[in-house]
């Protein structure tokens, strides 16, 4: 069922349509920097207890929107839900992060991999999407802001699946990639089909935009990235539903460390490309030539600076992009758990204030 969006600025920016100001949301905007998030997580008992309970997931998704006038909500979940649904036995170990009880390292392990039944294994995610959409909507059927769904990229998921958790050097997964590229391609093919099915299920449930997080694409060499990450992102994008309930569903992809490949990422069929803080936004806009919207890209560490410095850096990002359609303001990576919440308020306010001044002509970017 379609709802009237009270604020569609984010979706319009993704589709490179004119907006009155630059919309902003933050990667990991529902997270440990917020005391209310930590209180809800304590009630849930664990991270997975939070992520797998639609009521808790809805609660924490909405928390940043209660504090800040953000222009989009993003589903609270984790990129590792998909390999968990494949039966790899996900757990979060205190102080160590995610671990898989059954990593994928042998021919037999790969042979056992299959696209999970999304409705049977990941129903808690689609239920959360529906509950969040309901919670964002008032009695008159008006929805506050759009909801973003997401998944990890096939390569990024493979990193965790083969390593058995996080890694500093990706030795195990890269060893497989170079020694047994056939096995790696089989893993990535399953992952691509699973990610596409997962994102389509989120769209069916009510996600109004979706994002593919290629967190570890930047760990790959040039040439290797194209074959083992970008190719499979393109495979996912080609399978996605791009319209639902009569509305376009924009697709964003973000390869951390992927500035070198911006032109190629822009050719995958996505509507927007996320950028980390190492990329010059003005040059990036010239490179993509209006083909895609751009999302980003302030350094998350700016949020540890005093308010005046935060505002100055926000203006610099906005001035770099200039008075053009197709910019969504975001961090260049996820927000740190140590970020002072009041500093986020300064950032959101300055992005809205300064971008309105740029649009009105009251401020001309240098």
Swiss-Prot record:
Task: Give the PROSITE patterns listed for this entry.
Answer: UROD_1 (PS00906), UROD_2 (PS00907)
SUPFAM superfamilies listed in its UniProt record? UROD/MetE-like
| One Pfam assignment | URO-D
> Can you cite a GO biological process for this protein?
protoporphyrinogen IX biosynthetic process from glutamate
Mind listing the UniProt keywords for this protein, alphabetically?
Cytoplasm, Decarboxylase, Lyase, Porphyrin biosynthesis
Indicate where this protein is primarily found.
Answer: cytoplasm
Compartments annotated for it: namely: Cytoplasm
- What is the catalytic activity of this protein? uroporphyrinogen III + 4 H(+) = coproporphyrinogen III + 4 CO2
Q: InterPro entries recorded for this chain? A: UROD/MetE-like_sf (IPR038071), Uroporphyrinogen_deCO2ase_HemE (IPR006361), Uroporphyrinogen_deCOase (IPR000257)
* Gene3D superfamilies for this protein: 3.20.20.210
Quote one Gene Ontology molecular function term: uroporphyrinogen decarboxylase activity
- What are the site positions for Transition state stabilizer? 78
**Might you give the EC number(s) for this enzyme?**
4.1.1.37
This protein's GO CC annotations: cytosol
The lineage's top-level taxon is Bacteria
Record-listed substrate binding positions: 28-32, 78, 160, 215, 333
Subunit description: Homodimer.
Family statement drawn from the similarity comment of this UniProt entry: Belongs to the uroporphyrinogen decarboxylase family.
Function comment: Catalyzes the decarboxylation of four acetate groups of uroporphyrinogen-III to yield coproporphyrinogen-III.
Specify the protein name: Uroporphyrinogen decarboxylase
What organism does the UniProt record list as the source?
Answer: Paraburkholderia xenovorans (strain LB400)
């Amino acid at each position: 069922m379609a709802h009237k969006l009270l604020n569609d600025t984010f979706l319009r920016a993704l589709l490179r349509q004119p907006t009155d100001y630059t919309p902003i949301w933050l990667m990991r905007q529902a997270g440990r920097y917020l005391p209310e998030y930590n209180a809800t997580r304590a009630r849930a008992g664990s991270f997975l207890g939070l992520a797998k309970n639609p009521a808790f997931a809805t609660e924490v998704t909405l928390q940043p929107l209660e504090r800040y006038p953000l222009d989009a909500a993003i589903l609270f979940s984790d990129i590792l839900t998909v390999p968990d649904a494949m039966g790899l036995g996900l757990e979060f170990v205190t102080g160590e992060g995610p671990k898989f009880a059954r990593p994928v390292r042998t021919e037999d392990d790969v042979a056992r991999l299959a696209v999970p039944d999304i409705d049977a294994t990941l129903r808690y995610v689609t239920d959360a999407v529906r509950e969040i959409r309901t919670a964002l909507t008032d009695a008159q059927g008006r929805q506050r802001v759009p909801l973003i769904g997401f998944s990890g990229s096939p390569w990024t998921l493979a990193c965790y699946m083969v390593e058995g958790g996080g890694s500093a050097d990706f030795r195990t997964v890269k060893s497989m990639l170079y020694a047994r590229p056939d096995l790696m391609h089989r893993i990535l093919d399953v992952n691509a089909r699973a990610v596409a099915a997962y994102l389509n299920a989120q769209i069916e449930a009510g996600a109004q935009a979706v994002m593919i997080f290629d967190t570890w694409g930047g760990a790959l060499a040039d040439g290797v990235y194209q074959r083992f990450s970008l190719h499979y992102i393109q495979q996912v994008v080609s399978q996605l539903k791009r319209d639902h309930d009569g509305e376009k569903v924009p697709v964003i992809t973000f390869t951390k460390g992927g500035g070198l490949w911006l032109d190629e990422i822009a050719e995958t069929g996505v509507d927007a490309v996320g950028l980390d803080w190492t990329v010059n936004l003005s040059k990036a806009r010239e490179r993509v030539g209006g083909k895609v919207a751009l999302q980003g890209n302030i350094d998350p560490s700016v949020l540890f600076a005093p308010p005046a410095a935060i505002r100055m850096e926000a203006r610099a990002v906005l001035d770099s992009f200039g008075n053009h359609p197709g910019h969504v303001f975001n961090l260049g990576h996820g927000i740190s758990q140590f970020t002072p919440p009041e500093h986020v308020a300064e950032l959101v306010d300055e992005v809205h204030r300064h971008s309105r001044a740029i649009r009105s002509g009251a401020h001309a970017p240098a």
